[in-house]
UniProtKB/Swiss-Prot annotation:
Its main location: membrane. Its EC number is 7.2.1.1. One of its GO terms (molecular function) is oxidoreductase activity, acting on NAD(P)H, quinone or similar compound as acceptor. NQR complex catalyzes the reduction of ubiquinone-1 to ubiquinol by two successive reactions, coupled with the transport of Na(+) ions from the cytoplasm to the periplasm. NqrA to NqrE are probably involved in the second step, the conversion of ubisemiquinone to ubiquinol. InterPro entries: NqrDE/RnfAE, NqrDE/RnfAE_oxidrdctase, NqrE. This is Na(+)-translocating NADH-quinone reductase subunit E. It comes from Chlamydia trachomatis serovar L2 (strain ATCC VR-902B / DSM 19102 / 434/Bu). It holds the Pfam family Rnf-Nqr. The chain crosses the membrane at residues 11-31, 50-70, 90-110, 123-143, 153-173, 191-211. One of its GO terms (biological process) is respiratory electron transport chain.
């Protein structure tokens, strides 16, 4: 339940997969609004990236607990056997969003108290983290892949770090583009989308590499043999003598 068939090496594979190979921004293009709006300065992009990574990691872990102990069909059986047939999965999406919004509000209060400059730099985009589709998408991806708890935490952290990496790289490029001779009709949004597309193509070169599969589980053919009914042995070395 907590680690499943995943080893520590598999956890590293999940992190690298979520960060580079299946980057949540450059492979699924989730969270593009704040990515484009808050990447004009590297310091602002770095602060927003750290915030998204933190929110995604914490809310991914909390929402895993919500899924497996509250909303999953039969999840309430730990309270009472009489509740085993209750299915609250229709509330799952709403509860996920509530958890994300609540933690985002906590983060906003902390930044306002301890990092006033970053709080003012992010502006309206800080509370909009609550509806950042990259965070909800990362949570849903982890839930639908049926990760145990620790792999879910690592996947959420990797997805958040991948989004952070993408916006920091993009902000670095945009600062260079400010001093470049960009054609007039491509300035602004045009060159931003072209740059993002080129970054996505670079990360797409890692497509096909899968290093996140568990390696401690039994091979499928062993389980099949164990579950199949025994077959008669037609190649026995000793045969019954035929009746004369």
């Amino acid at each position: 339940m907590w680690l499943g068939d995943y080893s520590l090496l598999n956890l590293l594979g999940i992190f690298l997969q979520a960060t580079f190979i299946q980057n949540i921004l450059l492979s699924t293009f989730l969270g593009m609004c704040s990515y484009l709006a808050c990447s004009s300065r590297l310091s602002t992009a770095n602060g927003l990236g750290m915030s998204v990574a933190l929110v995604l990691t914490i809310t991914g872990s909390i929402n895993w607990l919500v899924h497996y102990f509250i909303t999953k069909p039969g999840a309430l059986a730990w309270l009472s056997p009489a509740l085993a047939n209750i299915d609250l999965s229709f509330l799952e999406l709403i509860m996920f969003i509530v958890v994300i919004a609540a933690f985002t509000q906590i983060l906003e209060l902390l930044l306002e108290r301890f990092s006033r400059n970053l709080y003012l730099a992010l502006g309206i985009f800080l509370p909009l983290i609550a509806v950042n589709c990259a965070i909800l998408g990362g949570v849903l991806f982890g839930i639908t892949r049926n990760y145990p708890f620790l792999p879910m935490v690592v996947f959420s952290l990797g997805s958040g770090c991948g989004w952070w990496l993408a916006i920091v790289l993009f902000a670095t490029i945009r600062e260079k583009l400010a001093y470049s001779d960009v054609p007039q009709h491509l300035r602004g949004t045009g060159i931003s989308f072209i740059t993002t597309g080129l970054m996505a193509m670079a990360f797409m070169g890692l497509t096909g590499i899968d290093i996140s599969k568990p390696t401690t589980s039994k091979p499928a053919f062993v389980m099949n043999i164990a579950t199949d009914s025994p077959q008669p042995n037609t190649h026995s070395s000793s045969e019954e003598p035929k009746a004369s």
